[in-house]
Structures are given as structure tokens and as C-alpha cells.
């Protein structure tokens, strides 16, 4: 599968005055978790392959957050991880061509939090109702090259 790695960093903040119950999307996302806690992200780094949070990542998120919200907050967590991405920036979804018992839903990249539910529903309808997958996300768009 044509996956690439990209490091992403997230903050969890506590912001009682923010009081939103919807996903806010700008140069970053702010997603409510409940109890006045919010997930804020994310960064995108192609070169750093560690899963360690960095000061640079934290500073980037704080600077972007200043432009999106104007209420006081406290950072309660800072995490990092490696996200799978795909050339063309479209997810990989469907039944693996070689290992048919393997179902794939991957490569959501930076928009995973936004498109994940729709892509998952599309996969469910494909598996359970026989509906076709959207050709932009169907794993079949990457034909396996067979050596002769």
C-alpha cells in the first residue's frame, strides 16, 4: 500500500469560557471533548519520524490557536504520533487485493477528524449492503504490479 509517514502533534486544552459543542476548523481544528476540554491540532511534519512531542510543534499550535479563539485556556496535554498519508491525499479504503480477509480504512491524513465518519459509513455500506465505494477512496485505484 502506498502509505507515507507524517508526524502530527496535538494539544488538549481546558477552556471553560470557550463553550462550544461543535468542531471548529480553521488553520487547525478545535474539537470538544466534554468538561470544557478540547483537542487542538494538528501539526504536519514530513521529516521528524519520532512520536515525541516537540517545543516547535507546541509553539506552532499555540500561535495558530491565538488566531482562532480569544479566551483563556490551560494546556493539559501535548501528544504526538505518526499518521499515515497517501499520495493524492485520498484515503485507502476497501478489501485488500492480496489478503482478502483484510479490510483497509487508512490514510485519512490531516482531514481524518473531518472525513473519518463519512469514509467509515461508506465502507460499512460497501461491506454490509454491497454498495460501491467512492472511486476516489477505493483501494483498487492502486493496482498491484505483478512481476513476470
Language model region names:
Residues 1-99:
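Active-site substrate-recognition segment that forms the wall
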Residues 63-148:
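Flavin (FAD/FMN) cofactor-binding core of flavoprotein oxidoreductases
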Amino acid at each position: 500500500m502506498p502509505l507515507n509517514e507524517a508526524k502530527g502533534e496535538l494539544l488538549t486544552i481546558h477552556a471553560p469560557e470557550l463553550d462550544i459543542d461543535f468542531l471548529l476548523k480553521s488553520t487547525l481544528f478545535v474539537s470538544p471533548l466534554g468538561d470544557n476540554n478540547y483537542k487542538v491540532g494538528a501539526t504536519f511534519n514530513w521529516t521528524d519520524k519520532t512520536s515525541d512531542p516537540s517545543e516547535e510543534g507546541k509553539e506552532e499550535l499555540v500561535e495558530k490557536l491565538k488566531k482562532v479563539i480569544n479566551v483563556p485556556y490551560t494546556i493539559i496535554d501535548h501528544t504526538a504520533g505518526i499518521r499515515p498519508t497517501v499520495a493524492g491525499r485520498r484515503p485507502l479504503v476497501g478489501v485488500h487485493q492480496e489478503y482478502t480477509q483484510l479490510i483497509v480504512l487508512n490514510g485519512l491524513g490531516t482531514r481524518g477528524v473531518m472525513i473519518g465518519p463519512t469514509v467509515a459509513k461508506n465502507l460499512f455500506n460497501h461491506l454490509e449492503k454491497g454498495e460501491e465505494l467512492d472511486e476516489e477512496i477505493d483501494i483498487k485505484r492502486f493496482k498491484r504490479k505483478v512481476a513476470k
